From Swiss-Prot:
The keyword DNA-binding does not apply. The keyword Metal-binding does not apply. This is Snaclec echicetin subunit beta. Echicetin itself inhibits aggregation of washed platelets induced by vWF, thrombin or alboaggregin-A. However, when complexed with the pentameric plasma immunoglobulin Mkappa (IgMkappa), echicetin binds specifically to GPIb and activates platelets. This is caused by P-selectin expression and activation of alpha-IIb/beta-3 as well as tyrosine phosphorylation of several signal transduction molecules, including p53/56(LYN), p64, p72(SYK), p70 to p90, and p120. In vivo, it induces thrombocytopenia when injected into mice, probably accounting of activation of platelets rather than inhibition. Belongs to the snaclec family. Heterodimer of subunits alpha and beta; disulfide-linked. Forms an active complex with the pentameric immunoglobuline Mkappa (IgMkappa).
């Protein structure tokens, strides 16, 4: 039940987009493409292999945005001695994750970076 130019695997539809966007714009783009669309998430290594089989022939050695990030909420941070983190001196840049199309290693990148991306939705 996927759209004609999408690929199906284990009850989900996938599409690689060869257009560079930042993480938030790519996520919004996926949400507009199809009902319940999002940047790709992975349940197991076979799903990863499937995504690589789609992305590598089209993109070669590139990074693609995946749905993992701390974009929507802050992680819980505390000092090693247990003190609360009340004073913060880091930049406000959020971190998102991109996957290598060669071996799917996940790499933390600034969410403002622009990469290709893969969308996923239920079939």
């Amino acid at each position: 039940n996927c759209l004609p130019d999408w690929s199906v695997y284990e009850g989900y539809c996938y599409k690689v987009f060869k257009e560079r966007m930042n993480w938030a714009d790519a996520e919004k783009f996926c949400m507009k493409q199809v009902k319940d669309g999002h940047l790709v998430s992975f349940r197991n290594s076979k799903e990863v292999d499937f995504m690589i089989s789609l992305a590598f022939p089209m993109l070669k050695m590139e990074l693609v945005w995946i749905g993992l990030s701390d974009y929507w909420r802050d992680c819980y941070w505390e000092w090693s001695d247990g003190a609360q983190l009340d004073y913060k001196a880091w930049d406000n840049e959020r971190h998102c994750f991109a996957a290598k199309t060669t071996d799917n290693q996940w790499m933390r990148r600034k969410c403002s970076g622009e990469f290709y991306f893969v969308c996923k939705c239920p079939a």
